[in-house]
Amino acid sequence: TVPAGSQPGKTPVIDASVHIFSKSNKDLRSFMREPFKSRGFPDYEMDWYGAPGGEYVEGSRGPDGQYPGSDPEIVAEHLFGDRGVDVAVLHPMGRGIMPDRHLGTAILAAHNEMLVSRWLDHPEFGEKFRGTIRVNPDDISGALREIEKYSQHPRVVQIGIPLQSRELYGKPQFWDLWEAAVAAGLPVATHIEPGEGIAF
């Protein structure tokens, strides 16, 4: 649904892929639990290729140098104020396929908790944000837990998986995941991220 206050008869402007991040690795760890909280994992930018002109929108870093896309107020100012967007579909950026599937699930679960508590339930802008619940296709039971936990949140609109996979996504080991997505009424979005495996 379109947020209250939108102009009647106006076609809403929806940004369908807004990348959001935690403020730092330390910030992300605040949403994690042991034994994973103290484990090592890659930084967001470890495997990125530098883009000509820079990776981020100018002025998008937080006031204390936080990652761009980590502050709901700054993102809202750019999207809803400067660009005239009505609804933003948020896609938390993870670390792709991890060698330890349980660590991978813990990282994505932390992103989901951050997404809901910091963005979707934001007192001022939450109504304009929609969320992508990130799940780990390498850990189906962990993925199903995340879907069950968040699928009834009114602002969750899709499930997100990395584009890369160790196996083709049509294979039987993924069927429980797709069936859970159908049962929840949530489409599945793919997004390229760091990691090793088969890329489409």
What is each residue range found by the language model?
Residues T1-F200:
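Helix-coil boundary/capping segments in enzymes
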